[in-house]
Amino acid sequence: MKLDLKILDARMRDYLPAYATTGSAGLDLRACLDAPVTLQPGETTLVPTGLAIHLADPGYAALILPRSGLGHKHGIVLGNLVGLIDSDYQGQLMVSTWNRGQTAFVLNPFERLAQLVIVPVVQAQFNIVDEFTESDRGEGGFGSTGRH
């Protein structure tokens, strides 16, 4: 798949999104910062990537997801948990960055911060019904299928 990428900050030419390994599902996104940013415990900030994408095809969307190491080791996750980039969005990719940890975290310029995953999308249409055809599960939810 070819994807239109717009470089909004010339410094990002050296830090384009890339797959870390041949088996990687996510492209690494980096913090486009002029200076280090310190996130205090509980603080959230919006971090620019210096990049914009245009998927164009409504059959695709992009997800901005946290990097597992930052979350596990430092408590750095996404403030919105998952960022959804619609196919018609053309603005800068921004990363809502939340320090849910107990200590301050310093985010350095061009540090890998999140990952971008391209996913297929199916746009549903609704068929309004008065009743559903009964299923084995029915309305059971939140633990209704048991623990084991």
Swiss-Prot record:
Write down the chemical reaction(s) this protein catalyses.
dUTP + H2O = dUMP + diphosphate + H(+)
Return the broad EC class: hydrolase
What does the record give as its pathway? Pyrimidine metabolism; dUMP biosynthesis; dUMP from dCTP (dUTP route): step 2/2
Q: What are the EC numbers?
A: 3.6.1.23
Q: Where does substrate bind?
A: R67, S68, G69, N80, L84, I85, D86, M94
Q: Name one GO biological process term.
A: dUTP catabolic process
Q: Which Pfam families match?
A: dUTPase
- Recorded GO terms, molecular function? dUTP diphosphatase activity; magnesium ion binding
Question: Keyword set for this entry?
Answer: Hydrolase, Magnesium, Metal-binding, Nucleotide metabolism
The record, for CDD domains, names: trimeric_dUTPase
Q: Which cofactor does it need?
A: Mg(2+)
The protein's matches in PANTHER family, at most eight in alphabetical order, are given as: DEOXYURIDINE 5'-TRIPHOSPHATE NUCLEOTIDOHYDROLASE (PTHR11241:SF0)
Under HAMAP family, the record lists: dUTPase_bact (MF_00116)
Q: Give the family, as the similarity comment puts it.
A: Belongs to the dUTPase family.
Q: What does this protein do?
A: This enzyme is involved in nucleotide metabolism: it produces dUMP, the immediate precursor of thymidine nucleotides and it decreases the intracellular concentration of dUTP so that uracil cannot be incorporated into DNA.
Q: What is this protein called?
A: Deoxyuridine 5'-triphosphate nucleotidohydrolase
Gene label: dut
